[in-house]
Every structure is written in C-alpha cells, then in structure tokens.
Amino acid sequence: MIIFAMAPAFAADNYQTDIGPTPKNGRQGANVQGRGTVLATLDRTTFTIQGKFAGLSSPATAARLHMGNVMGGTGPAIGDLNIPQAKSGEISGTFTLTPAQVAGLRLGRLYIMLDSQSAPKGNLWGWFQPAHVTVPEGTPQMGHWYIPNLLDGQGDGPAKKSNS
C-alpha cells in the first residue's frame, strides 16, 4: 500500500505588526505608552490574531481590528479583539474577512488599535505586514531583508522597474 501526503490546496499566509504608542497631540505624550507584538494567520478568509502588549500607563479598555484607506491611514473597525482590562496582557481574535478586507490586508491596510483609560481614542496602533525577520534596534542585517513592498502587488521586495 502506498500512502501519499497531500498538502492543502491553499497555504495560510502569515502577518505581523508591532503595536506602539501613537499620541494624537502633544498633551497625550505621557499617557500614551507601551508596546506589543501581534502575529496573525490568514487561512482563506479566516484571520486569526494572537499577540501581547505591555507597559501601558493605565489599563486597556478595548482593542479593535480596523481597515484604513492606505497603510498608516485610519478607517472603520472590522471587529473587536479580546484583551484584559489591564496594563499588560494578551490580544486575540478570529474574524471572517470579506474579499475586500483580504485585499486590504495584502495591501497593508488592516491595523490594530488598542485603547486605554488614559488614551481612549488609541494608545497602541500597528498595521499588519507580511511576516518578516525583525531584529533589535542597531543590529546590522546582511542581504535582502527589508519588508516586502506592498505597492507592486508582488509582495517580494522593491517595486520592479519596466523598460517597456
């Protein structure tokens, strides 16, 4: 008897974001603190999010997945994420994305916004990008390492130049 191992027809895509402080104005500086890392998997239309955050100046109150018009741009919430009402903890959630939301994810338009008591309109923010190597600040890297260019539609590096 011969047994063949079959790979799934569609492999899951991995994404990540580092969520960090995003003060809306100079008065919020001391209140907008903390950091986090979030990993996500897209399996067809199921988007599963797992991550951690820490260092908030006050307890978290809510976290949501959003879709903006561009990477770095803001937009409406897609849905709520699970978080503890604490200064540190885990972030999680599972969403069924629409085709437009899947396309937005692939263009870097989906992001997380975590609110806290001292920054109720966004304490930590981060836009999802394809999973990539990250290293500590000041660590040199060799070779092709930069985040894929989402603008050329290939997700494989700098936009290609055409001679035609």
Question: Which positions does each model-derived feature cover?
Answer:
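N-terminal signal peptide c-region/cleavage motif recognized by signal peptidases
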Residues: 6-8
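Metal-centered catalytic cores of metalloenzymes
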Residues: 10-63, 67-164
